[in-house]
Structures are given as C-alpha cells and as structure tokens.
Amino acid sequence: METLSFPRYNVAELVVHIRNKLLTGADGKNLSKSDFLPNPKSDVLYMIYMKALQLVYGVRLEHFYMMPMNIEVTYPHLMEGFLPVRSLFFYMDSFMPICRVNDFEIVDILNPRTNRTSRFLSGIINFIHFRETCLEKCEEFLLQNKSSMVRMQQLSNVHQEALMKLEKLNTVPAEEREEFKQFMDDIQELQHLLNEEFRQKTTLLQEEYAKMKSDISEKTKHLNEQKLSLVSLKEVEDNLKSKIVDSPEKLKNYKDKMKGTVQKLRSAREKVMEQYDIYRDSVDCLPSCQLEVQLYQKKSQDLADNREKLSSLLKESLNLEDQIESDSSELKKLKTEENSLIRMTTVKKEKLATARFKINKKQEDVKHYKQAMIEDCNKVQEKRDAVCEQVTTVNQEIHKIKSAIQQLRDTKKREILKSQEIFVNLKSALEKYHEGIEKVAEERSAKLEEKTAELKKRMVRMV
C-alpha cells in the first residue's frame, strides 16, 4: 500500500465522492455507509462500476446483457444469468490497470471485501478527478484554438480588404485614365519649362550681378586712387607753401595751375558720383528681380508639394503593402502557434504515456526491492543469535503477519479452487446437457426416419 499513486479514502469520503461524481438523483441519495460496512453490497457495487464505465468508456446498460459478436456459442440462452457479471469483469479488467490497480479479480465482484473495495473505489475516484482535470485542460486548448482560428479569419478578412483597397488605389477608372495621363503629362511639361526658365533667369541675374560687382569694385579702386592723389597733392601743397617765393607773378601762376587741377578733380569727382548713383539705382532694381525669383521659387515649391503628395500616395500604398505583409506574417504566426499547440498536446500525451510507464516500472522496482529487503532481513535474522527482547517481539509480530498472509493466501487458493470447481461443474453440466440434447436429437431423427419410411411404404401400397 505504500506504493499507491492515489490517496486512500475512508467510507464517509467515498460516499461523498460517489454522490458527487458517479451516482445522481435517487441512487445517490439512497447511498450510505451501510452499503459498504461491514460487508459491501454487490448490487451497489454493480451499479457504481457500471456508472464509472458509462462515464469513462461510454458503455451503455444494454451492453452488459449482450453476447459479444466475436464469440460463437451454440446455446447462448444458457449464459444469460452469468453474462452481466462476465461482461462487467471484462470491462473492469481493462479499466482497473488504468486506475493503478493491478490485482482486480472476479471474486471482487462476486464476493467483495471492504478493504479491497475501498482501495478499488479510491483508485476509480482518483482517476475520475484526473480525467476531469485533463478534460478542463483539453477544453482550454480547444478554446484557444477556436479563438486563434477566429482571429486568423478576421486577419484574413482584413488582409482581403487591404488588397481590395490597394487594387483600387493602383487602378485608375477607365473614364479617368485619359484625364490622368493628360494631367501627368501637363505636370511634367510645366515642371520642365519652369525648371528651364528658372535656370535661364538665375544664370542671367548671376551674370549681371557679377558684372555690377566687378564695376563697383573698379570704381571703388578708382576712388581710392583719387583719394590717395588728393592726399599726395595736399602734401605737395604743404611743401609748396613752405617754399613760396615772394614774387606775386609766380604765385598767381601757381594759383591758376592749382585752380585748374582742383576743377579737374571736382569734375572727376562729380563723374564718379554720377556713376555711383547709377550703380546704386541698378542695385535698387535688384529687389524686383528677387521678387520674380521668389515667384518662380513658389511655383517650384508648388511643384514640390505636388511631388510630395504623389510621394505620400505612394507611401500610403507602400504602408498598405506593409500592412498586408504584416497580416500575412501574423497569419503565419497563428498557423505556427496552432501547430505548436498541436505539438504541445502530442508532447503532453507522450509525457503522460512515459509517466505511466515510469510509474509501472517504479512499482515493479519497489516490489523487487521489497523482496530483496525481506530476503536480507531473513538472512540477518538467521545470522544473529543473541537478540534483545524488543527484537524478539518484533520477530513474533512478523511471524504473526506472515502467518496471516499465509492464511490469506490459503483462503485465496481455496476460493480459486472453489471457483475452478464451480466452473468445471458448470462445464460438465453444460457438456451433459449438450450430450442429452444431441441424444434426443438423434432419437428424434431416427424416429422421423422410421416414420418417413413407414409413410413411403404406405404410399407405395396405396399406389
């Protein structure tokens, strides 16, 4: 009992669990402890076992009273009384090893005992709990699969809608194709013409601006030279003032010369100022040219905006394509998730099978280990001569337990022999019954042959 893989319930717990899991209605209400103590009732156990088989395997009630189709029996009506017990044992013999009970026998149906039946019912209830948890997990997996399928359907619908939108954006209606082509051609021509005009005017303005810059630089150089000449003349004048001669004639002549040079310088200065004013007017004309340039720039900006609009439309189409690709990737992910869920279920089934195999193997190992330990204990007990009083009492208890086990084995053998004798007696009775039937059939066939012979003779005589 130490190697059981399920808890051992008492009678009260068994009654509660059976009412909750197996028996419902009046059967569950009528169930009580007296049905299991002191000796369990076979009728109640039949009903519990049948309900468990109906719940797990889906076996209907009429299946217990039907002869299997793969068995040929000459007189099936003779087995009607034993057939429900035989079919119940057949189903329970395959069901109890699943509940981790490997010693279920037909005696447990015909003559049940309290300890064994409580262990069997504990195993059945534990398996039903395990089955319910597995069904809940399976339902969760099915709900997840259903939700993923619904999501995949939604994404496929969104994918199709996006494809339709993309086709609408890419395709131009037949009525507007010519206008669209003309519009695109006009835009390209205008863009080309504006670019050429803008380039020509910008080149001309740049050339004029460069010329004006060069002229202004030349004039400024000339002014600087004139200023330098004035400074040099002032220096010469100062020098000459220091060297003035007292003769008035020379002074007059020198003054006349100086006046002439001053007039020349003034006339040159006026010419330079006039040219400076002209260049200043030309520089003032530059803003109007700049306004024209700004207009051309605005036109080019409008063209750039149109280009940006076209690029935005292209970007939207690309975004739709990206969305379609992302939707397709999500569809692939959902498919991979579905495949992974299927793989998880298969892996869990394999793990369950391996766990069952390991548990069976552990039980066998524990049995072998117990046998080895018992043999070792016997050897140690034989080797030790002087033992304490406690050890002797323990040995006596062990001997008592062994004798009880031996008695149980003897009773088990006796019951097996009794069942075998009953089976042999039933078999011999059936054989005798078959022989009697065969004899009666032979006698009747002989009598029929005699009667037919007599009738034939009478017919011949009549003829």
From Swiss-Prot:
One Pfam family per UniProt: Nuf2
GO BP annotation list: attachment of spindle microtubules to kinetochore; cell division; chromosome segregation; mitotic spindle assembly checkpoint signaling
Segments of this protein annotated with the region Interaction with the N-terminus of NDC80: 1-385
Record PTM: Can be phosphorylated by AURKA and AURKB.
Localization per record: Nucleus; Chromosome, Centromere, Kinetochore
The keyword Phosphoprotein appears for this protein: yes
Broad class of where this protein is predominantly found: nucleus
UniProt modified residues of type N-acetylmethionine: 1
Family, per entry: Belongs to the NUF2 family.
Function: Acts as a component of the essential kinetochore-associated NDC80 complex, which is required for chromosome segregation and spindle checkpoint activity. Required for kinetochore integrity and the organization of stable microtubule binding sites in the outer plate of the kinetochore. The NDC80 complex synergistically enhances the affinity of the SKA1 complex for microtubules and may allow the NDC80 complex to track depolymerizing microtubules.
Subunit structure: Component of the NDC80 complex, which consists of NDC80/HEC1, CDCA1, SPBC24 and SPBC25. The NDC80 complex is formed by two subcomplexes composed of NDC80/HEC1-CDCA1 and SPBC24-SPBC25. Each subcomplex is formed by parallel interactions through the coiled-coil domains of individual subunits. Formation of a tetrameric complex is mediated by interactions between the C-terminal regions of both subunits of the NDC80/HEC1-CDCA1 subcomplex and the N-terminal regions of both subunits of the SPBC24-SPBC25 complex.
Protein name as catalogued: Kinetochore protein Nuf2
Organism: Mus musculus
